[in-house]
Amino acid sequence: AVAQLAEWGRRVDVPVVTGPEKADPASVVFDGMERAVAEGIDILMIDTAGRLQNKDNLMAELEKIGRIIKRVVPEAPHETFLALDASTGQNALVQAKEFSKITPLTGIVLTKIDGTARGGVVLAIREELNIPVKLIGFGEKIDDIGEFNSENFMKGLLEGLI
């Protein structure tokens, strides 16, 4: 995953901060935060992929990462997105609930909407947790992600049903 992020950073000319193999994720976040502040970088994306809501140690790491972020920039994070695979189904609601307990979520990134999955669970997430979908992914190319459009999403969700 680290190599993949570094490769995407290279492709789009965006710096990527990584740590040594098996590094404490919070220390890598600290290094990224320090670099962003020192270089006047306005946007810092932190990828905590692989955090499963049923893995206490990984969720504890996520909590620690939140503390580190606030230590460096007390008013941060400004946005916290949860990436959800459109094919996850109702388990996505459970994920969103559990992650919301650890860190306030400001949006959903709905991925893999290019297959048969339609991602209708985001309606339940919006209803129960008031977390909007901000971005939607249709594939793996740089242009395959964009702002969420609720009208287009609903058309796709209902396509073939009515």
Predicted regions located by residue number:
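Nucleotide-state-sensitive switch-loop elements of NTP-binding domains
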Residues: A1-E79, T116, G120, I125-I162
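Non-catalytic positions within long, well-ordered alpha-helices that form the structural scaffold/packing
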Residues: V37, S100-K101
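Asp-centered catalytic/switch region of ABC-type ATPase nucleotide-binding domains
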Residues: P77, T103-L105
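A compositional/biophysical signature of low hydrophobicity enriched in polar/charged and small residues
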Residues: F81-L84
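Short, flexible helix-loop junctions that flank or precede catalytic/ligand sites
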Residues: Q90
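Helical hairpin unit composed of two closely spaced alpha helices linked by a short loop
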Residues: K97, T106-G107
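Phosphate-centric recognition/catalysis
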Residues: T111
